[in-house]
């Protein structure tokens, strides 16, 4: 549905040249929810704006629905853009128009008959859960409701693709979850292809089928969400994954934590489990094999792309030789183990 090939984007600021994207290629199959994650300034907003040519690439090809957009005339591009909806971090609603009027606007600009506008807008407001807000004004809506209006407006022309530019960044966590569930529901019901960009791995984890990691204008990793979470190939992907599971060391342990082992001290370990290592009874196996005892301090588990992954803080009791052997064995069985210190 979306195919970007060898996209390069260069901005000129006076005598200064800024390369925002460098030879980026990305394929989003029809009906998928595809996430692009990166830090601020990585180039993700430029990338998504190249899809509908809000930013025209310096080099490369943009195919949407089998159509090459970069070669279209202005009128042809306008027609093609009707098949590409877009929502933003800021909702960009017209304050002087009601909810109904905001959603109706693209249909009015397309000279759609009034009866058809009424039918379509009513249908869309029901779809996004705002069937009772026809006559409300944006000033009287919450942030989540405003984004729902923006989603309905983006769907007004019945597009095949929806682009989401940091669509949940301005929302609180509970509202973010509800908007993501709405996008997932729309994808399921309408078969809509969704390309979203974000700096939050939680967003990717909740709804995406595939994910690409962007850094300094280049895609450094891309795969299914389950594969990236199970076997991240780059340090940046690992960092984003760690941000979704975070365990703080309890204060009483922090007060006792030492950088080097002392008499009768034991190592405090941070363990990350992904893929098959989540379900395997690895800790009990280390107890049997190496005569160590694991005291679990805290743990957390979650799902991404249908795959479980988890994190755990433990004390490992045993001799130095036993604990070292147990740690090496865990690492051989795809558990990432970090010694945080000694308590």
Curated annotation (Swiss-Prot):
SUPFAM superfamilies, A to Z: ACT-like, P-loop containing nucleoside triphosphate hydrolases
Ligand binding (ATP): 38-45
GO molecular function, one term: ATP binding
ABC transporter domain mapped to chain residues: 2-241
Cited CDD domains: ABC_MetN_methionine_transporter (cd03258)
Its EC number(s): 7.4.2.11
Catalytic activity: L-methionine(out) + ATP + H2O = L-methionine(in) + ADP + phosphate + H(+); D-methionine(out) + ATP + H2O = D-methionine(in) + ADP + phosphate + H(+)
Annotated GO CC locations: Gram-negative-bacterium-type cell wall; plasma membrane
Assigned keywords, A-Z: Amino-acid transport, ATP-binding, Cell inner membrane, Cell membrane, Membrane, Nucleotide-binding, Translocase, Transport
Superkingdom field: Bacteria
Enzymatic class: translocase
Compartment list: Cell inner membrane
Membrane topology: Peripheral membrane protein
Coiled-coil ranges (or none): none
Known partners and oligomeric status: The complex is composed of two ATP-binding proteins (MetN), two transmembrane proteins (MetI) and a solute-binding protein (MetQ).
Family, per entry: Belongs to the ABC transporter superfamily. Methionine importer (TC 3.A.1.24) family.
PANTHER family in the cross-refs: AMINO ACID IMPORT ATP-BINDING PROTEIN, METHIONINE IMPORT ATP-BINDING PROTEIN METN
Role according to the record: Part of the ABC transporter complex MetNIQ involved in methionine import. Responsible for energy coupling to the transport system.
Record's protein name: Methionine import ATP-binding protein MetN 1
Native organism: Salmonella typhi
Protein's gene: metN1
